[in-house]
Swiss-Prot record:
Alphabetically ordered keywords of this record: ATP-binding, Cytoplasm, Kinase, Nucleotide-binding, Transferase
Binding site for ATP: 12-19
MF GO annotations: ATP binding; guanylate kinase activity
GO CC annotation: cytosol
Organism: Streptococcus pneumoniae (strain ATCC BAA-255 / R6)
Protein name according to UniProt: Guanylate kinase
Length: 208
């Protein structure tokens, strides 16, 4: 039976570039892990593909899945739901395949309670001015919504201590490489691999 895969939880403030860094990781990486597509009730943006960038669902459909207990995590953010389908994640991990979750900070904290041995990576902007420029540059939100996102970002950055790693997105390729290095190192963490060496360990404490 294959070892259970590694659950990688990747999050950060809105506009920090999570999706861009994630795409860079998957396009340039030889690591064998699977991207878990999140589900959301927000409007589909130009260029986004249902089932690739997100599963786009109505609010009613999403709330029904919550009632059925079919979400690993979910959160409501600026009037929209975001979440991770549970069945897909467990089936993939059980096959020994690493699963990469790109989710909101609220959702990441829910996952930490349920899967404390997951790897939690927080992507940060260089500073708040740069974050605001990125949000404005997207051209998808009103000034009021952008202001809400900046205030929310401050709250989320304050939760960075709940994560295992913090990586600044000052340049996409560098940020992606840093994330890949973290994932590679986690595969050799003693707590994760010690089970393979049980037969080499003494059966009982030795005395002199």
């Amino acid at each position: 039976m294959a070892d259970r895969g590694l659950l990688i939880v990747f999050s950060g403030p809105s506009g920090v570039g999570k999706g861009t860094v994630r795409r860079e990781i998957f396009e340039s990486s030889e690591n064998q892990f699977q991207y878990s597509v999140s589900m959301t009730t927000r409007a589909q943006r130009p260029g986004e593909v249902d089932g690739v960038d997100y599963f786009f669902r109505t609010r009613e459909e999403f709330e029904e899945l919550i009632r059925q207990g079919q979400m690993l995590e979910y959160a409501e953010y600026v009037g929209n739901y975001y979440g991770t389908p549970l069945t897909y994640v467990n089936e993939t991990l059980d096959k020994g395949i690493d699963v990469f979750l790109e989710i909101e900070v609220q959702g990441a904290l829910q996952v930490k309670k349920k899967v404390p041995d997951a790897v939690f990576i927080f992507l940060t902007p260089p500073d708040l001015d740069e974050l605001q420029d990125r949000l404005v540059g997207r051209g998808t939100d009103s000034a009021e919504v952008i202001a809400q996102r900046i205030e929310k970002a401050k709250e989320e950055i304050a939760l960075m201590r709940e994560y295992d790693y913090a990586i600044v997105n000052d340049q996409v390729s560098l940020a992606a490489e840093r994330v890949k290095c973290v994932i590679e190192a986690e595969h050799f963490c003693v707590d994760r691999v010690i089970g393979h060496y049980q037969e080499m360990l003494p059966k009982s404490p030795t005395t002199r």
